[in-house]
Regions:
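General helical secondary-structure elements
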Residues: 1-2, 23
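Hydrophobic alpha-helical membrane-insertion segments, chiefly the h-region
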Residues: 16-27
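Mature, Sec-exported extracytoplasmic domains of Gram-positive
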Residues: 25-172
Length: 172
């Protein structure tokens, strides 16, 4: 009788561990992330937050030109291109102006949406800019520039001025 109980307990623990792993993986892939959550996460950023603190929260620093291709960014682009859930957090500090962005792949409309916040000056940029999942990479003098093509947001009928977004640069 004791042996059966022990096996049962062990099986329960294994099941719990697997659930934990699944949850962690889904969180990493952006499952359950919504535009509202992305927006609120940015609005909740402290006015005195630093680049280092954003990096600690999982934001990728894309200031300037990176020394190599970033795997997390490439994975995000690949997932969005293959209609898989994807979320990407970026930060940069160009001209001493700290910026935080959350990009989210929207499966319903098959596009990438972006939310942008400048926490130090507590300024948010018009939320939910839309981009095509066909990401453009151009190589010039050994520097690869990865650009998102801005597309019309199908849920907002207003004609907006489309502006492509440079995601990041890296040296080949």
């Amino acid at each position: 009788y004791m042996g059966k109980k022990r096996i049962y307990v062990a099986l329960c623990l294994i099941a719990l561990a697997m659930l934990g792993i699944c949850f962690f993986y889904l969180k990493k892939t952006g499952w359950g992330m919504t535009g509202d959550k992305a927006w609120n996460e940015l609005l909740d950023l402290d006015k005195n937050i630093t680049l280092e603190q954003l990096e600690a929260k999982g934001y990728i620093n894309v200031t300037g030109c990176l020394d190599e291709e970033n795997e997390t960014i490439s994975e995000f682009i690949d997932n969005a291109g293959n209609r898989r859930p994807a979320v990407l957090r970026l930060t940069s500090n160009e001209n001493d102006d700290l910026c935080a962005k959350i990009l989210l792949y929207d499966k319903d409309y098959n596009f990438i949406q972006m939310w942008t916040m400048y926490p130090n000056r507590q300024q948010a940029v018009a939320p939910g800019k839309c981009f095509s999942t066909d990401v453009v990479s151009s190589d010039k003098d050994g520097v690869v520039t990865v650009t998102l093509k801005n597309i019309q947001n199908p849920t907002v009928p207003t004609e907006e001025i489309l502006q492509d977004e440079m995601l990041y640069k890296w040296k080949k």
